[in-house]
Amino acid sequence: MTSADSDSEPQQPGWLQALGIYRHPQVAAMLFLGFSAGLPFALVAGTLAAWLTRSGLSMTSVGMFAWVGLLYAFKFAWAPLVDQVRIPVLTRALGRRRSWMLCAQIGVAGALFAMATLGPTENLLIFAGLAVFVAFSSATQDIAVDAWRIEAVSLDMQGAMAASYQLGYRIALLISGGGALAIGDEMSYSFAYQLMALLMGIGMITVLLVKEPDVPAQKGTQQLSILNDPAHWINEAVVQPFVEFFTRNASQAVVILLFIGIYRISDMVLGVMANPFYLDTGFSGLQIFGYVKTVGLFAVLSGAALGGVAVARYGLGGPLVFGAVILAVTNLSFAGLAIVGPNIPFLVLTICADNLAQGFTGTVFIAYLSGLTNVSYTATQYALFTSLMVLPGKFLSGFSGAIVDALGWISFFLYASLMGVPAIVLAWLVSKHMQLQANRQD
């Protein structure tokens, strides 16, 4: 090999250089946008369920409120509007992505204030409608934030952006979950929700400070009105994102979609049964809260940061395969805990392994999905990918309890781990395809 050939080969960045990616201003801004995206989630889920329970509602009524969260899984349905529709005044002042982020954040904050003012005992139907509006606005914010994240930086920085997003998101979940619960019990849930609404201001300030990505709307739809020519608009904004994806990826499109659907399926199937398993094993609620919220949070954030560095240093292929492997393998630690019983050190080991794997794969997979999108249809395509990622696991997790009842905990965890094997195979195939594409471009 000549020196010229050697010089022309791309060099992998060192670990210190890879870590330096977190100093980028857009990566720092992503931390606060991730916080804004994560804050409403618990407020229409676990924290809301606690408020309803404290207010004396029946378990049937409390359970029905869980359907509010389905809006997150179907956000692809209105993602084309976020991609293409201009908001009067705001879009001209802030740009396409920032205007939708700010509008959604105002919607979340306003509805949270209204929920705090009304309360569930005054008019449950209106209260439920406000909860639905919070979820809708929150899901809309997710669409816009994801689009901004993908368009704001190059592909090699998507791992760091995903890690920063996860960090902000997890901190927000801790505040709107554990923090709001504590405030609600000690003071009132109305005050807790008012405080959470005020914290949405963090995201609003961030939106006003960051730059709008320099990516134009799809030609032909930027000025197109859905009212003037709805058929043309639907074709350009809804149909074309799907056509473009299948045209660009050709025979690999089906493999990619299948991979998206099953990559994290073993983790989702197990996750819904984690707390019941801890309790059934003999751990107290205080022990679970203490270790999951402290050790678990540290582990998942560490995994997220490592995932960002791995993508910056090695690209996406290797980390995708490694992530699929550790997701399947770490599930076996739960089987070990089921054998050992209520052993605190083994509990800590299990929580660390599981959350480290979740954080790592979360970052890597978000970066991968970001690279799949075409910037002309960022919001629509990414919303479709994330919905596809969630729906199969959510569906299969509904059968987890029946499997535990029929086979027991150890067999269930072995089953959950084996469900990760197809993901490993597909991750390897996708990695090889990415490598072939890179070689052709070289």
Question: What positions do the PLM features span?
Answer:
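Glycine-rich segments within core transmembrane alpha-helices of 12-TM secondary carriers
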Residues: 72-75, 159-184, 388-397
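Helix-to-loop junctions at the C-terminal end of transmembrane segments
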Residues: 75-93, 302-319, 404-405
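C-terminal ends and interior cores of transmembrane alpha-helices
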Residues: 99-121, 325-342
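Juxtamembrane intracellular "pre-TM" segments in multi-pass secondary transporters
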Residues: 7-23, 215-255
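C-terminal transmembrane helical hairpin of 12-TM major facilitator-type secondary transporters
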Residues: 317-365
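Symmetry-related core transmembrane helices of the 12-TM Major Facilitator Superfamily/SLC fold
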Residues: 103-109, 191-209, 413-429
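Intracellular juxtamembrane helix-capping segments at the cytosolic ends
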Residues: 139-153, 360-374
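Helix-loop boundary and gating motifs at the non-cytosolic
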Residues: 12-72, 253-259, 263-277, 281
